[in-house]
């Protein structure tokens, strides 16, 4: 029998409110969705559709995107983008808190990660921006080897730290957010 993930432990180690924005950069937010019932706690990741001109084309990430003028705040951005991209209505689930603001490697966008726990099973409905959804058990993230690799970015090529999860390369913003999550003391929990 698999243990249930300890949501109270995670909630106690997150920021209770949205992280502080730097006024000089555009903002976006993502939803770090935890399924506490799946293999002792799993995280939802997506593969973005490959599109010309999209700097995140084909990359592994979290549901999320840029803040729209109609969004009341970054939390609403994460909720809206998750509903649009994968069909999960986060209002029906539990907001655990936030992680600190993360800036993209190009320093063009700052991203607020909000952490949610599912209260029930969900059926994914991907839109055109997403080609794949998958769950990564936290216990497996703790065992993945961090490797340096060269990736193609808008500016050319960049040497980055990354995880390889079943042939899916997790690097950049997603890699840093996952490390922030694991750095909340969860590595000893799973």
Annotate the PLM regions:
Residues 126, 130, 135-157:
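Amphipathic alpha-helical blocks and their helix-capping loop/short-beta junctions
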